[in-house]
Structures are given as C-alpha cells and as structure tokens.
C-alpha cells in the first residue's frame, strides 16, 4: 500500500513539474513578446516622441522593456527551480511572479487613469507644435517628426489642413508661398504645398489629431492585451508553483 502511495506521489510530482515547465516556457515567451513590443515602440515610433511631448508614452515603452526583461530573468530562474526541485528557489520564483503581477496591475490602473490626461496633452501640444514650432530654427527634430506623422498617417494639420494658415512657418518667407507643408501632399515633390487642393492635399476628417489619438489608443490596447495574457499565465504559474512546493514539502516529511 505504501509502495502504491509512493508511486502515486512520484506521478503527481512528475506531472506538476511538466505542467510548470510548460507554463514557464510560455511565460518566458510572453516576456520576450512584452520586451519586443517595448523595443518596437521606441525604434519604429521614436519619430513621434518629440510631438507627443509628454513623457508618458516613452515611459510606457521603457516599462515594457523592463518588465519583459524581468519576466525573462524570472523564467530562467523558474527553469532552474523546477529541474533542481529546490523549495527555496520555488519560493523565490513565486515571489517574483507575484511582484511582476502587482507591477502589471498598477501599470494597468495608471494607464487607464492617465489616458485621458495624455489625450488632452496631445490635443494642446500638437496644435501648438504645428503653429509655433514647425519649420523654425533649432526645431529640425520637431519639423521632421511632423513631416513623418503627416506622411505616415496621410493627414494634414492638427484638426484639418486649415490649421496651417495661422502657423509661423506658412506666414514666414521660408514657406515660399506654400499654403501647407510639402509633407501634406499625397505625392511629395518640391513646393507641392503651394496648391492646397483635395486632389493634391490630404483632407482627412479630424486631421492628424484623430489619427494620433487612434495610434496611442491602439498602442495602449496592444500593451493591455499582452499584459493581460502574461497576467493570466502568471496566475496559473503561481498556483502550479504552490502545488509543486507543497508536494515537495510533503515528500520531504
């Protein structure tokens, strides 16, 4: 009878290890995905950071990279703890899972709280950037960011192409008679902005503001989806870790 119980204990222990090992693999992959999203945000979308002004957007990318790195490091620790069957390592692994889960929870709450604030900042700062800073001396980075924004999102002006009529750049001699910057043109050629006709200029309802807001919303949605996926995995992982730790403790005694 005792022999059967020992075999059953070994069977349960082996299956718990396999399940936790599989979880840890997907958890590690999830961490790599989180880090990849953060790096992608900084590399591919860094051209918009000078327009966004608020540090919230850039900070979110750095947080993703940090959390992703922490998840991957925790994953490596998890593999070692599972293979060695060390209770102390499993306890550390569980604590790290819990810390990461709490960080994700706090980040999710802050993202929800600050989204409206970020949206309001975008509306004010984008219009200010277009009218006051575009095309000005020592504002080459901002000018390049606005040009890229208008070409990538196929838009013109903050709310419409009419916003450019009051900009410092269009009213200056450097504009050379342009009604809008050349980056507003569907086909960019030299001085194409002199003719602000719908066949030549992007006339998008809501202008670049609507496009930029959608970009930020999609970015936060992607972060949220990845975060929720990793958080769900963590709950499963914490349960499996507790079960394996308890089984090892019972086996020891």
From Swiss-Prot:
Q: What parts of the sequence cross the membrane? A: 19-39, 63-83, 93-113, 220-240
- Cite a GO CC annotation: membrane
The organism's superkingdom is given as Eukaryota
- Enumerate the InterPro entries for this protein: Tetraspanin/Peripherin, Tetraspanin_animals, Tetraspanin_EC2_sf
Task: Please identify the protein, giving its name as recorded.
Answer: Tetraspanin-11
Which Gene3D superfamilies does the annotation name?
Tetraspanin (1.10.1450.10)
Glycosylated residues, per the record, are: 127
Is Membrane among the key words of this record? yes
What is its membrane topology? Multi-pass membrane protein
| Compartments, as annotated in UniProt | Membrane
Extract the Pfam families matched here. Tetraspanin
* Species this protein is from: Mus musculus (Mouse)
Name the family the entry cites: Belongs to the tetraspanin (TM4SF) family.
Keywords carried by this UniProt record: Glycoprotein, Membrane, Transmembrane, Transmembrane helix
């Amino acid at each position: 009878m005792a022999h059967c119980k020992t075999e059953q204990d070994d069977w349960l222990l082996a299956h718990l290890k396999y399940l936790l090992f599989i979880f840890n693999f997907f958890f590690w992959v999830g961490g790599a995905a989180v880090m990849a999203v953060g790096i992608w945000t900084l590399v591919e979308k860094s051209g918009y950071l000078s327009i966004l002004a608020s540090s919230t957007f850039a900070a979110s990318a750095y947080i993703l990279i940090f959390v992703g790195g922490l998840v991957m490091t925790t994953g490596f620790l998890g593999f070692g703890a599972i293979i060695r069957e060390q209770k102390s390592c499993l306890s550390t692994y569980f604590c790290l899972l819990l810390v990461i889960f709490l960080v994700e929870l706090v980040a999710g709450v802050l993202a929800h709280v600050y989204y409206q604030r970020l949206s309001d900042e975008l509306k004010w700062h984008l219009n200010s950037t277009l009218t006051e800073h575009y095309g000005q001396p020592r504002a080459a980075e901002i000018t390049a960011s606005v040009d890229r924004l208008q070409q990538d999102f196929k838009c013109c002006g903050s709310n419409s192409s009419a916003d450019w009529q009051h900009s410092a750049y269009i009213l200056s001699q450097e504009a050379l008679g342009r009604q809008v910057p050349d980056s507003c043109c569907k086909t960019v050629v030299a001085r194409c902005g002199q003719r602000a006709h719908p066949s030549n200029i992007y006339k998008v309802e809501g202008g670049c503001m609507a496009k930029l807001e959608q970009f930020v919303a999609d970015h936060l949605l992607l972060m949220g989806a990845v975060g929720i996926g990793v958080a769900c995995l963590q709950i499963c992982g914490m349960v499996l870790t507790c079960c394996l730790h308890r089984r090892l403790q019972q086996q020891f005694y």
